[in-house]
Amino acid sequence: MNQQERNICYNCFKEKPEGGGPCPCCGFDLEENAAKYPAALRAGTVLKGRYVIGRVLGQGGFGITYLAWEQSLEAKVAVKEYMPGEMAVRIGGLEVQPRSAARREDFAYGKERLQEEARILAKFMGQPNIAGVTDYFDENGTSYFVMDYVEGISFKTYIANAGGKVSTEEALNVMIPVLRALTAVHGEGLIHRDVTPDNIYITKDGNVKLLDFGSARYSLGDKSKSLDVILKVGYAPKEQYIRRGRQGPYTDVYSCAA
């Protein structure tokens, strides 16, 4: 289902005049966003009869994250789609399929990992420093999960805006909430594996959120992929550089210190 015929902006979701060009309210340019992410769902696509897909927030090796509009609550949310570009292709603008029969097993394995991550993250709805999962479902041959949409800036941007460094007090004000979030996550047996400044967000009201859990859960491990596709140089401990390195909560602690 698609709502492209409606004249709305797929960033601020406000009505806009007919015709192309950037939104007069927020300046968002849909054509530019679509050209940047050709493998993404078309803006205006409706998932599960309730989530109107908007602009692409980001794309990684294993999936695409969209801004979306939840129609019943009339609120912005973030929707993650399992779309591993190296092993999958989109058919007819919607359906996601493995590129070949040889990739079918790997595709299914990664899809299961996404579903597992969503189920675990759904347990953290009451944790103030984690963007909780509110829904997950299968559609278009792949899997999706819906998260709180966090408006703010990344800690990476915050540091850059501060001239490349922050005070000890500022660093502690950010990292202590991150450690609280990791304590809850580790208690459920999940390891983040990608604690970096660009995955830590400071919201408009000053709250701190740790995002993008389970990057390594998307890794296909012994099946075909090595962990180097998800580690970030300068933040990853040595066990993440080893194909079968033993990882645990200490992996995240190292990244926090780095």
Outline where the language-model segments fall.
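Conserved short submotifs of the Hanks-type protein kinase catalytic core
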Residues: N140-S154
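AlphaC helix of the eukaryotic protein kinase fold
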Residues: I91-F124
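Activation-segment/catalytic-loop signature of the eukaryotic protein kinase fold
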Residues: Y136
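AlphaC helix of the protein kinase catalytic domain
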Residues: F155-V166
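Protein kinase catalytic-loop region centered on the HRD/HxD motif
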Residues: L179-L190
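Activation segment signature within eukaryotic-like protein kinase domains
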Residues: V174-M175
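Conserved activation segment of eukaryotic-like protein kinases, specifically the C-terminal portion
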Residues: S226-E239
